[in-house]
Each structure stands twice: as structure tokens, then as C-alpha cells.
Amino acid sequence: QRLLDGLRERGAKATFFLCGYRMEQYPDAMERYLEEGHELGVHSTVHTDLTKLTPEQLREDMAGTAQMIEEMTGIWPVLMRPPGGAYDEKVLREAEQEGMRVILWSVDPRDWATHDARQVLSTMAREAGDGDVILMHDMSKSSVDAALRLIDELQEKGFCFVTVSELAERKGVSMTAGSVYEDFKEK
């Protein structure tokens, strides 16, 4: 809740890629994500390497997670992020069949590997720029601290924080299902 409170206070938006088991743990957050203008996407059911699944297991995982999101919010997600960024042709085909765009990242502060908010913030502040997609996790206090401090620093420099779909639209990128996007920088 602290992350959502901080985003709201700063007028910042985010895209949250959700695991099924986490949605079950925090059902109240689902409605709040949408009420406050955030975007939701599929991560997986239990955070597994999607490339290791059979086509049937993959379909069950992706469609099942999407269905959970739809049942809780009324919206079918059009974005997905494979755990660890691991994807192959099978994952891309399934994403296309489910109508999902595959979103990776261009800045990874490795917040999942450390509990040092200063280190995470330093990496993000050094690497983040216009059109970047920043990978972060909302499961630790240090990640939330770093995210909110980064938003403060970059907003002071004129940056704004928007959802992935809004970023693509602002940059004139028409995303297509089954395609992979790491950033939306001017090429």
C-alpha cells in the first residue's frame, strides 16, 4: 500500500505485472491499481520460467493469470512480462494468441538482489532516461524506498511516470501482440 500511496501523492503511474498467487494474497490492491490509473499485465501464475513449460502448460499459465486479472477487474490484460525476461518462440506465439505484447526492460537496478535502497537508487538515477522501461519489484521496503526517491529526483528534472501503454502512445509506437518491447527511446 505504501508504494500505491507514494505513486498517488506524486501523480505517477506504473504498470504492474502480476503473478496469480500474489493476486490471491492481495485482492484489495487490484481495484486500487485501476482506480488510480495504473496498468496491469500478466507475469505468470507462480513466477516460473515460461520457456520450460509445454505449450499446454504455457497456455494454461498465461491465460489463467489473465483470466484472474479479468475476473478481479473486468479488464483482459494486453501486456505480459515473462519471469526473468525469459522467452522463446513458443512464448511469443502464445502471447500473440492471447493478444498480449511482451514487455521487457531497459533499466534493471536488480532491486530483487539487494536490500540497499541507495544502491538501487544510484543505478536507476544513473541509467534511467526518456523512454526507458524500469524493472522494479514491490515486495521489499528497500525497493519501494528507492522507487519513490527516484520518482522525486526524476520529476525534479522534468520526467513524468506513465504506464507502459501510455509511454508507447506518447512515443508514437503502435505495439502489436506477440512482439517484444524493451524501451521506447527515440531511435
Regions found by a protein language model. Give the residues of each.
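C-terminal domain-boundary segment and adjacent tail
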Residues: D5-A14, E24, S142-K187
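Conserved, mostly hydrophobic/aromatic
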Residues: L7, F16, L40-H43, T65, ...
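Active-site-proximal beta-strand/loop segments in catalytic clefts of secreted hydrolases
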Residues: F17-Y21, S44-T45, R81-G85, W105-D108, ...
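A broadly tuned preference for mixed-charge, low-complexity surface segments
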Residues: T45-T48, A63-I69, V133-S140, D152-F161, ...
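Structural recognition of alpha->loop->beta junctions
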Residues: E35-E39, T73-W76, A128, G178-K187
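Active-site beta->alpha N-cap acidic-glycine motif
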Residues: Q1-L53, Q57-I75, C160, E169
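Alpha-helical scaffold elements lining the catalytic groove of polysaccharide deacetylases
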Residues: Q1-R2, Y26, T48-W76, G84-D130, ...
